[in-house]
Amino acid sequence: EDCYIETPFHANFGGAHVHFGKNVYANFNLTLVDDTHIYVGDYTMFGPNVTLATAGHPVLPELREKLYQFNLPIHIGRNCWLGAGVIVLPGVSIGDNSVIGAGSIVTKDIPSNVVALGNPCRVLRPISERDREYYTKGRRFSEKQ
């Protein structure tokens, strides 16, 4: 409901296993490897070139040769923001209100209400009252806006 998805948009199964909440925004080149379910909460935003991959393959060469694959669901909470170029791997959950920095590779669960970034993605800090005053480094919200 009231979602806005920029094109191009890519999904393995045409989004058949994708469950978006209301008011989800996705910038261009959102790629959903939806071999199993992907759940996205209300008011979540995706920057350009984000990939959510539910499928993976074994490290063991003999198993890959047999075309083995595993599929694990991804859960993205309510009101999250995933920056440009983020990659979320199979089985990961991201808690409500969290921000994932651009270029991060999310290999493990991220709790609610944090800023996380990096490769592998790690929690940098909690979202705090300071974030009500500053919208980005050194830039304050103005009462006149």
Tell where the protein language model's regions lie, with residue ranges:
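Membrane-anchoring hydrophobic helices of lipid-metabolizing enzymes
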Residues: 1-2, 7, 11
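Conserved catalytic segment of ABC-fold P-loop ATPases
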Residues: 95-98, 111-113
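Short-chain dehydrogenase/reductase
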Residues: 81, 99, 105, 115-117
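Flexible, glycine/small-residue-enriched loop-and-beta-strand segment within the central core
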Residues: 9-20, 25-93, 119-120, 125-136
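Leloir-type glycosyltransferase catalytic cores
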Residues: 138-145
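Short glycine-rich donor-binding/catalytic loop of glycosyltransferases
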Residues: 103-104, 109-111, 121, 127-128
